[in-house]
Amino acid sequence: MTQANNTVYTDLSVDELVKEALQRGEGVLADTGALVVETGHRTGRSPADRFIVEEPSTQDAIAWGPINRKFPADKFDALWDRVEAFNNAQDHFVSYVHVGAAAEHYLPVKMTTQTAWQNLFGRCLFINPEQFNPAGRDQWQVLNVANFECVPERDGTNSDGCVIINFAAKKVLIAGMRYAGEMKKAMFSVQNFLLPAADVLPMHCAANIGEEGDVTLFFGLSGTGKTTLSADESRYLIGDDEHGWGEGVVFNMEGGCYAKCIDLSEKNEPVIWKAIKHGAVLENVVLDGNKHADYADVSLTQNSRAAYPLEHVAKRAEANLGGEPNAVIFLTCDLTGVLPPVSILNNEQAAYHFLSGYTALVGSTEMGSGGGIKSTFSTCFGAPFFPRPAGEYAELLIKRINAFGSKVYLVNTGWTGGGYGVGKRFSIPTTRGVIAAIQSGALVGTETEHLDIINLDVPKAVPGVETELLNPRNTWADKAAYDEAAKGLAKLFTENFKKFEVSDAIKAAGPQL
């Protein structure tokens, strides 16, 4: 299709998109065949530039505030028209994709991008259906125009870039953003608003499935280990980041993975390593003179990324879905060295820690957070992506856990033997040992020890894991220092939890001073 002197490229193949990106100077090829691109001054998401249009059909259901910022409908319409006109005056790329692998819950999406590489990214991360929109549902539109510069005084934006979701119009506008993660997270936010109305819990988690059909969920913020731990050569990958949990099913919302690349190694992450080949996209990864990726080089960002389709993963779940989860794992990266490598949670503790979402920002995906590491609380282990009040998601989680009988665990992938700078981080093999024990069922009904201040129950033995690591107090040389650190962490938890209106039983399930 041609408009004026420009071409609209529709549903190009991976090979064609790579060719277009190279011809247009958008990136270069690594020695593996992956397309390598740079995203400019934004190398992570920009939460301050994300808005939701305020309109009658959804305004009373959204938890408005610093995360879900209001945007006027008339300003949105004007800006959409402006960006669309800018995009229509030049070559651009259109693909028709789905978000949501379950037949009952997919969204059909027309994805329009100014650049070939961002279209390739979308083809990696979204689902490329054999038949587009077989149920004939209303279509969503994503318009992603990287080189458009917003003018805040004219457009009502916060800066030269924006991500704006309009539920009534079924539109997502992304302007001035080269960091492609904005596109996937915008559609994640859309599903996170829509799915609870269908009694489906949307989740910021990874998922995999064992040979016997047992499913494990891995909740966690960026950098806590979702992608790494779910990419297990002994299990089938469902997905690494975005899922829905409904009656009888856990389904991936995506068709690909978006892995952090910092210090990536073939030894520790063989599944991810092998997936980075022709058709994959490397964002902000530095190449050496031989076009070989240097994953230790953080000169562009600590948030370097690899986007690849699930087809690049040898062991993957058929149809990107599985049954309900036997094990639900909350991954937390504890900077204080106070939390144990694994705790067994009851339902009230599960609700408490799901609402708290305690972890650390590690090589954060958000702009402005810098390279430093700091503790944070992110409700539902993904606060930036959940438009509804947090309690609605927590109620759905407990409903699903109760109905299926899932077991819930808190797994610390952070520090032990002291806090950050003193202790050491749990090794990936140690954490994999914990995960393997959980998945084998070895921790169900096992003998536990109660840790008073942090109010957690830890197993006395975990197959394949050193026993002295299980009670964190034992790993500290200075026991009094551990007790003080535990009290400090408990105070952080209780201060953060004051904002939640929940039952006394859930309040009592957290750390106690």
UniProtKB/Swiss-Prot annotation:
Binds 1 Mn(2+) ion per subunit. The gene is pckA. ATP binds at K185, H204, G220, L221, S222, G223, T224, G225, K226, T227, T228, E269, R305, T431. Gene3D superfamilies: 3.90.228.20, Phosphoenolpyruvate Carboxykinase, domain 1, Phosphoenolpyruvate Carboxykinase, domain 2. Its cofactor is Mn(2+). Pathway: Carbohydrate biosynthesis; gluconeogenesis. It is an enzyme of class 4 (lyase). Its main location: cytoplasm. This is Phosphoenolpyruvate carboxykinase (ATP). GO terms for cellular component: cytosol. It catalyses: oxaloacetate + ATP = phosphoenolpyruvate + ADP + CO2. Involved in the gluconeogenesis. Catalyzes the conversion of oxaloacetate (OAA) to phosphoenolpyruvate (PEP) through direct phosphoryl transfer between the nucleoside triphosphate and OAA.
